[in-house]
Amino acid sequence: MRIAVLSRNPNLYSTRRLKEAGEARGHTVDIIDTLHCYMDITMSRPAVRYHGEELPYYDAVIPRIGASITFYGTAVVRQFEMMGTFCVNESVAISRSRDKLRSLQLLSRKGVGLPRTGFANRPDKIKDLIKNVGGAPLVIKLLEGTQGIGVVLADTNKTAESILEAFMGLNANILVQEYIKEAGGADIRCFVVGNKVVAAMKRQGAEGEFRSNLHRGGSATLVRLSKEERATAVNAAKVMGLNVCGVDILQSNNGPVVMEVNSSPGLEGIENATNKDVAALVMEFIEANAKPNNTKTRGKG
């Protein structure tokens, strides 16, 4: 098979591993810089051009699109969908996952466990917003944040008010969530491939840090999931329409709650923590599912 990995950096661990895993299984794997792709969208025969030439037909495309290029990246994926190429994650699903509020609304509507969550831009009654989600301690997030940036823990209602007032000054959209104290600064990253959790790790925040992101000095270890945690991760992936994703779960007194569904999960942390060849499992999924026009939206989304 001929497979394209859409990635801005061929040296990233995840990109390298996908290429290695594909080639080890006898496939041709090209790494394509998403932003260097360009298209004539009025052509009767859809195509993607790159470095002055039309790209060949690919049996599958693996989008590795960073949050900062979501708009253009999903347009490129959509063009491949219009060409009939199988895309591991569809453009509509990627766009959906990048909108944190929309994601939480969809998950809530389908009954997926979530922390109590409020959403605001410029609330005229800050105290009521805080009260509505159960009061401090609270986690306050900028909607556009990634890797733990723009995430603050407010220990008291007064602190929460001050943080919200500061964030409002940025003219930003804000999420306010209950703090799951019993999670102890840890979360579980479930790596889902084709409606199955293929690997899972527990990420523990550094001492004194409530955020468990590995980019912020957290550590990761292999974890055994309960049936409920496994089902929650798979259900969240289905609701979001993602074939390959990372589902971040907190262990609360009321059962597992989903914090985020990541459409471009990194491989380094999960492979190192679990000693599993996750990249090869992604390739297995492609081999079983990559058929022409096997994309639900077919670029119409």
UniProtKB/Swiss-Prot annotation:
The keyword Hydrolase does not apply. Mn(2+) 2 binds at residues 260, 262. GO terms for molecular function: ATP binding; metal ion binding; ribosomal S6-glutamic acid ligase activity. GO terms for cellular component: cytoplasm. Residues 104-287 form the ATP-grasp domain. GO terms for biological process: protein modification process; SOS response; translation. Gene3D superfamilies: 3.40.50.20, ATP-grasp fold, A domain, ATP-grasp fold, B domain. Keywords: ATP-binding, Ligase, Magnesium, Manganese, Metal-binding, Nucleotide-binding, Protein biosynthesis. It comes from the Bacteria. Binds 2 magnesium or manganese ions per subunit. Mg(2+) 1 binds at residues 248, 260. Mg(2+) 2 binds at residues 260, 262. This is Probable alpha-L-glutamate ligase. It comes from Saccharophagus degradans (strain 2-40 / ATCC 43961 / DSM 17024).
